[in-house]
Amino acid sequence: MSEKEGKRKSKTVEKVSPKEIADRIKKTADSIATQINKQEDPEFITMQRGKSNVVWDEKKGYLGLGEKEITRTFLNIAHARKFMQTSMIMAKTREYLEHNKTASIREIYYELKHTVADTKENTFEGQDESDPIIVDLEHSVDTIREKLNLHANPKGTLYGDITLLDRMHHNDKFNAAKLGRGGWSIMSRVEPEEIEIVDSNAEYLLVCETEAIFERLIEEGYPKANKCILIGTGGQAARGARRLIHRVHNELDLPTIVFTDGDPYGWYIYSVIKQGSMALAAHSEFMSVPDAKYVGMTIDDVKEYKLEAVTERMSEGDIKRAKEMMAYPWFQNKEWQSQLQKALDQKIRIEQQALANKRLDFVATHYLPEKIRNKNFLP
């Protein structure tokens, strides 16, 4: 396949303008104002969060939020403070959207924190009060935090033949394979309105749990030799990394393969990328990749690659997590039930970097190419 024939053009998806989000906030605020003008007790309605309202959508292949709602009323003394805080955050996020400004969730907390006039009452006592209000607003106006022009600390790195356009910074156009070995640091906000995915010559996306393996694969020339895009998550994938994984998979129509440590923590990292998380179940549609496949590490790899001497014992936390995962509906298939049971029976875990026991380049020259070529995946 020639480079020209192999180039994948991005499809524009999930693009919602800041004006549309600002209008949704205004509509909610107008509804509250109308109730006040009618001398009614104003209400703010959002979705109930928590495990009891998380549902597994087997047909779509990801976690979602149920239909349980909570109603916050101003005249309820238990709700009044949160109602005030919600109104402040609604006004401030709409201001950000209208003036094309972004803020971290820490910055909006400080911007809105003050003592109410003629009282000793602070608007917010800590960020642990403002963060949940932001989530409430996300659910109320049916969007994600990033589209409210809010962001948290970024984490994750992108490398490979993929061209991006940064609309928020002079329309800079760059290829992530030409930024040095360090690649591109994934921002916490990678929405289509800001970061456009232009095109790519890659044939698949490989997501790595550890930065050490991410760097090893780059050093060995794996992305170029195997025509893939790499994303290193540095542990559990941050929101920005999950959003970018979702976008690359869908907009470039690329297979997504995940590579983590062979333990319950690594397997859960995979499940969050694939099916979403309970904490962000409302946003799985924009962050999950139900078609993702898992390449390793697995307990079966220990025998297959003669790694018995470099396994580690599972901790009590690992054992507890494995038992919990066996009960999750999205792990109810024979492949994962078998893998989890083997881990519990043998009480071992195997890290990605244990492959260095064979030799440093083994992961890049043998392990990944062979397993991917043979489609030796877990679902």
Regions flagged by a language model, labelled:
Residues 1-255, 264-379:
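Nucleic-acid enzyme cleavage-core boundary/entry regions
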